[in-house]
């Protein structure tokens, strides 16, 4: 008999499940990044009836489009399948019926497995036509020298860059991810917004591959993944052509934005076709072996097109990217300023005997496991400081850690990192946040908390953090409280954001 459950997903992917008999349980996802990587590589190596590899079958007009969906495959499809595999197997077997109370990562993978979302949209031709018309009209009405890529009008990742461009008096136009609301609003309250991200209309490929070597669950997964990415690639190819037409009469000299590896390819390739110089700016600590779309494992470097130039925060990041991937040319990677403002600070000595530990919110991490660390640290007498993220509600962020009653109230909330706030901190700990790297310059004790989410374990491998296990918290010796010895100048350039933009964004191809 088919079971029926109702599921609410928390911000970090933890599922709150309610059964038909009103009992409730919590499902903690699996965060096995190695398994997601294994599925990605196996998928890329599938062969069609003629023996051609899947990764070689999506060329169009001189471009291999398969790399444009690697991020989606790894994170949204294979990563989510690994996260929720026990439930998804029951779903595939027809033993489970799921009512989703909200949209999240489970909803994404369920839709993919059920073939939902492939070309389903209210009047897609009309929507795409409106986007194309908006872009064509905007380019002609508003002249600008820089096309500035952002996810949304209030994207915190690019706030500092936007302010600096304003201070420099640069004529720029924002390129934003399209949505029905934003597009329709802009039709009537016209702003100089250029949109990217059209709606899929049809699958131009429909290729078949040999799945005889995989189990039935993997076969279902690969079939669904194939269907989804073929829709995406088909849409990307069409979107690129729309952008080429819209940009025909533009005056853009430079296309600039964060180092995205998913949504930006159609506009990026169109800019390159129109001889517009393209520059990416590092936005996070993603240059490690577990970020598939920066590593591009199994992809030939000569077949991967990305930005003409990449600005990294420091020599450390340039070296890391070149160490974990073979698809990048060293002469296209330069060192500039951190997108989140310069971070050179004076270090202060740790106060003897004080146990103030800073743990930042990490929505991609195993927050349940980190919550156990927080609880035990409090029980051991540590004062836990929690750095909240600016784009989610504080209550929702804390809720992801599943803390016992009474423990959330004991957290000291930090809204913004400042030198003064860091004077109160002795230890910085986490598993996945860019902030852990950014705080190395303060010379604090740095801990990498052991969980099944190993995204930033290179912190330990490079000697920038101590690996701390939950079962060892009560018996840590003095070596665990030695401050981190990392060279701030190697991690983060002393150059200002203003100088970086003038040198690498506003100076053409220099």
Regions found by a protein language model. Give the residues of each.
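Catalytic-core helical/loop segments in enzymes performing group transfer/polymerization on anionic/lipid-linked
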Residues: 1-510
């Amino acid at each position: 008999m088919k079971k029926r459950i109702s599921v609410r997903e928390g911000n970090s992917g933890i599922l709150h499940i309610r059964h038909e008999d009103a009992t409730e349980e919590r499902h903690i996802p699996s965060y096995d990044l190695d398994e997601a990587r294994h599925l990605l590589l196996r998928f890329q190596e599938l062969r069609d009836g003629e023996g051609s590899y899947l990764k070689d079958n999506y060329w169009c007009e001189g471009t291999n489009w398969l790399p444009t969906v690697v991020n989606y495959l790894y994170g949204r499809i294979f990563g989510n399948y690994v996260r929720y595999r026990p439930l998804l197997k029951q779903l595939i077997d027809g033993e489970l019926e799921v009512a989703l109370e909200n949209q999240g990562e489970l909803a994404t993978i369920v839709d993919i497995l059920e073939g939902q979302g492939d070309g389903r949209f209210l009047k897609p031709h009309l929507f795409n036509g409106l986007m194309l018309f908006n872009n064509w009209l905007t380019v002609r009405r508003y002249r600008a020298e820089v096309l500035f890529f952002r996810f949304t009008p209030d994207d915190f990742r690019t706030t500092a860059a936007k302010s600096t461009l304003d201070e420099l008096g640069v004529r720029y136009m924002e390129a934003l991810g399209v949505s029905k609301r934003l597009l329709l609003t802009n039709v009537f309250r016209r702003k100089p917004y250029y949109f990217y991200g059209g709606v899929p209309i049809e699958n131009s490929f429909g290729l078949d591959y040999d799945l005889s070597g995989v189990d039935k669950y993997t076969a279902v997964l690969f079939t669904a993944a194939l269907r989804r990415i073929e829709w995406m690639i088909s849409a990307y190819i069409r979107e690129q052509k729309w952008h080429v037409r819209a940009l025909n009469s533009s005056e853009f000299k430079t296309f600039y934005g964060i180092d995205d590896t998913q949504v930006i390819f159609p506009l990026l390739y169109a800019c390159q076709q129109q001889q517009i110089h393209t520059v990416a700016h590092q936005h996070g600590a993603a240059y490690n072996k577990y970020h598939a779309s920066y590593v591009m494992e199994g992809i030939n470097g000569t077949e991967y097109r990305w930005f003409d130039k990449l600005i990294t925060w420091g020599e450390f990041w340039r070296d890391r990217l070149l160490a974990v991937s073979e698809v990048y040319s060293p002469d296209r990677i330069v060192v500039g300023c951190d997108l989140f403002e310069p971070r050179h600070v004076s270090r202060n000595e740790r106060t003897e005997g004080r146990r103030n530990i800073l743990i930042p919110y990490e929505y991609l991490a195993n927050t349940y496991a980190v919550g156990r660390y927080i609880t035990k640290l409090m029980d051991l007498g540590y004062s836990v400081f929690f750095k909240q993220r600016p784009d989610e509600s504080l209550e929702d962020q804390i809720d992801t850690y599943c803390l016992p009653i009474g423990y959330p109230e004991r957290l000291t909330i930090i809204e913004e990192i400042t030198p003064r706030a860091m004077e109160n901190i002795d230890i910085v700990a986490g598993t996945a946040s860019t902030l852990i790297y950014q705080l190395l310059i303060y010379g604090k004790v740095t801990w990498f908390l052991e969980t099944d989410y190993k995204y930033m374990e290179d912190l330990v491998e490079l000697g920038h953090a101590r690996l701390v296990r939950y079962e060892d918290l009560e018996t840590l010796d003095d070596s665990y409280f030695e401050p981190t010895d990392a060279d701030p100048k190697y991690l983060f350039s002393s150059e200002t954001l203003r100088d970086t933009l003038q040198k690498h964004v506003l100076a053409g191809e220099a």
